[in-house]
Amino acid sequence: MDNKFNFKSIKKAFADRVRPSESIYTSKNNSYVKYGEFNDFPRHLIDLYNNSSIHSTCVNAIVDGIVGEGLVSSTSDILDRANPEEGWNDVYRRLALDFKLYGGYAFEVVYNKSRTRVAAVYHIDFSWLRAKEMNYRGKIEGYYISDEWGDKYRYSTKTVPEDVPFLPVYNPAKAQEEPKQIYVYRPYAPGQKYYPLPDYVGALRVIDLDEEVDNFHLNNIKNGLAPSLAITTFTNADPDQRQAIELMLREQYQGTDNAGSLLYMDLDSPENAPVITPIPQNGADGYYTTLSELVTQKILTAHRITSPMILGIKTPGQLGGRDEIIDAYLLLVNTVIRPYQQTLLTSIEEMLEMMYPEKGDISVGVQQLKLFADGEEEVDVVTSTEAEVGEDSELEAEIEKADEAADADSNNDRFPI
């Protein structure tokens, strides 16, 4: 169809976003269970984490709180080696991030040759897991592991290729026939039979909106707060000439580098002058600014962060005093961080007792972070849900004793007798 009026709109390109369904669908031949409608729900969570500054800050702050000052134990040296390449603190940090980001975590359990104990534990990225469909008893027998689930061609047949590893679920009673198993923690979530949901699942749309608000402001700047001008020419140019004029205008006036540029035209007669018509702004920038504040508050609420000052975000009307920040952080620790820690510690203790059966019951804790150098508890250790009463106090006393010894050694080095 001919363009009768030689009119062309200069459009900005926007990428289509596909939101994965939270429902779980099985493949046609029941070989594995898709993680979201398009089998890419973990990828969606990763994109939100990478593209929303508020959301990623919340996740990182909580993960830092979960990790704390690191793992501690009264049993010496057991935390030094989870596998030949990593210690338990390395594995613990990765598990903590997966737990917060996806709502669950997983690691590979490798038995020794005699199958009498666990020889090594390796973290497995939770986004790589796809569950085998439940058996008739409602139990998941194992998981397929791959980092290529997004390859639609590779998985277009709805079946798992033969080269994709499969690990049976952790069961020490089957160690003889299954030397490698997978330990998966997935808390109960209503309506979810196979995969967990992150605790911020109710804010997924709001987090996506945060990314779009930033995208609006970025494109407004890059496109010269467009469209602010309508330029009409009377040259009866052909399509190639119109495209050349459009490219020239974009290069000369679009973007922040060209702000305040001078518009200069040299024409052979006034009759050929273009018509330049200002387009009034609709006030969308103010609307998106207000929307951004609402989005920030909703994301903080989803992560159960009562005070944005914990993240370094200043809120109008709040004084931001030291005591207020400490109180808000302690509330976050007790209601959010501590439950994460206790769950992770329970899993780690179970593995350590399988690695060192001769040591009996093993107690592991996490030394909590301190916001300030003084004014808080000197040492606070969180232990697992399986820990006996008083074990946290014992670990705290040992840490304080070790710190005092380290301080004494430091003073002796500075002031030798």
Enumerate the predicted regions with their spans.
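A contiguous, surface-oriented mixed alpha/beta subdomain in the mid-to-C-terminal portion of proteins
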Residues: 181, 187-347, 358-365
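Activation/maturation switch segments at domain boundaries
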Residues: 281-289, 322-417
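Structured, contiguous alpha/beta core segments that scaffold functional sites
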Residues: 1-59, 65, 69-267, 374-409, ...
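Generic structural signal for bulky hydrophobic/aromatic residues embedded
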Residues: 110, 301-303, 351
